[in-house]
Amino acid sequence: MSNQHMLLLFNLLPVGSNISTWWNFGSMLLTCLALQTMTGFFLAIHYTANINLAFSSIVHITRDVPYGWMMQNLHAIGASMFFICIYIHIARGLYYGSFLNKNVWLSGTTLLIILMATAFFGYVLPWGQMSFWAATVITNLLTAVPYIGTELTNWLWGGFSINDPTLTRFFALHFILPFTIISMSSIHIMLLHTEGSSNPLGTNSDIDKIPFHPYHSHKDMLMLTIMMTALFIIMSFMPNIFNDPENFSKANPLVTPQHIKPEWYFLFAYGILRSIPNKLGGTVALVLSVTILMTMPFTHTSHFRSMTFRPLMQFMFWTLVATFITITWAATKPVEPPFTTIGQATAILYFTFFIMNPLLGWLENKISITNM
């Protein structure tokens, strides 16, 4: 589309008329990013990146700073909203074959990895018990890297244990990475607009397009309003619903929490990590749990783009959704039967989806050719 920039200027960007509510999550993610950047800035003004003062500075923000409690809660709950939206956004991409737009999909997966790193660094900053021990467990995984693992870990820590230099660099990274996310998001959107969105049918939208404004812009506003309403209801009535009780105690390296676990949005990866009773194997599986998404454009064998007309693949997709929820739940439980068995079974099921994707595509092609 040669005159696309002129159309964008006049807000007449042509969009497929049949894209559903599942296509609204991109704009919701953009809103989450703006919200996190703003609240994060106001929190950073009052935060102190020192192991003796970090916990107290969070208490100071929530108690003494005007509207500090609101900034802190919005930032914490906003992170959960961000991940809810991004997981739905990815699920939409998997279901409707958006991954066939390779550049958009690969830039999106890179964005997810940067976002997860940013959220992890942010979780360490309050320097509560769970912050400290989650950081200890996750950064320790670097020691599983052959030959250079220990050196890598000490380099990341800035010493021989998690200490003040670790917190300082995690704060610096947590501050700088969102700007990388903003840059990558711009690239992601630019790449999307070179080819345009897919649609529920998985067909070419060129024959039936409508202006983005007012049609899709109003649809986006509805979902944004629902999301912001949900955010403020949670903030007002149950602000600590996503928090871990352990994190209300200051970090103590001498006392280990009974059950170390990260934030809920990392639990699926954490569940896969601990389902393998080997440090290196678990670390590889943890990395693969996210990076395996990058294989999707290269393993698609079906003649159909979308899963709308692929019942076998639909079954696999909804199994993946159930598996994701089950791993998340199992990872909150102690490392004992039956939770270990459930974790191992669901970890196998999770990767089965990506293995079955090319096989089922090939099988469906065979069936459709036979029936013609």
From Swiss-Prot:
The keyword ATP-binding does not apply. The cytochrome bc1 complex contains 3 respiratory subunits (MT-CYB, CYC1 and UQCRFS1), 2 core proteins (UQCRC1 and UQCRC2) and probably 6 low-molecular weight proteins. Heme b b566 binds at H89, H188. Belongs to the cytochrome b family. This is Cytochrome b. Binds 2 heme b groups non-covalently. The lineage of its organism: Eukaryota, Metazoa, Chordata, Craniata, Vertebrata. Coiled coil: none annotated. Heme b b562 binds at H75, H174. It is found in: Mitochondrion inner membrane. Heme 1 (or BL or b562) is low-potential and absorbs at about 562 nm, and heme 2 (or BH or b566) is high-potential and absorbs at about 566 nm. It comes from the Eukaryota. Keywords: Electron transport, Heme, Iron, Membrane, Metal-binding, Mitochondrion, Mitochondrion inner membrane, Respiratory chain, Transmembrane, Transmembrane helix, Transport, Ubiquinone. One of its GO terms (biological process) is mitochondrial electron transport, ubiquinol to cytochrome c.
